[in-house]
Amino acid sequence: MRDQDLLRQIRDERWIAELLVQFDFDLRRAENGPVEAVRLPDGGALEMIAGDASGGAFLLAGPPADNRPVVYAGSEGEGGLIAADLRTALALVVGLPSLHDATSMPIGDGAALREWLAFADDEIREDWPELDDDRARLRDALGLPEPAGLLAGLHAAAADERYRPVSELGDVYEPMTS
């Protein structure tokens, strides 16, 4: 499915859009654009499609195409590529406690990071007991892959300098990963 078809499905099926807000992916936040105007290092365009509660922006990169890379631009000046397409980006958003948690430490062999993410999920479940059921509902409705194996891809994507947002003043955003 093309990115635009996926976005249309989210907009058309209100329960999906509302549930994605709980996962900190809110299409309504795109109405006002990102906290500051950003572009790709090569001058390429970034189109905001959603935002998160911290003021961060999810942006499609480059010229219109069936599937476009997804860049995250955080409100604290951190950002970068998170996925090759919207479906993979949504799998990360839905399947992980947060992108910030998933990029908070080096991936290494992945064991320490997976342990940290499991702890974060347990904390979330204390206030949101339906977390796993809601994840399954969204994966099924949107045809999202399981997040297993996506962590390494997220870390590799975030290291790609070609997608690091640049402000209007020419300031390059900090990497998302440590």
Model-assigned labels for residue ranges:
Residues 71-115:
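Compact, glycine/acidic-enriched structural inserts
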Residues 100-141:
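Hydrophobic alpha-helical interaction segments
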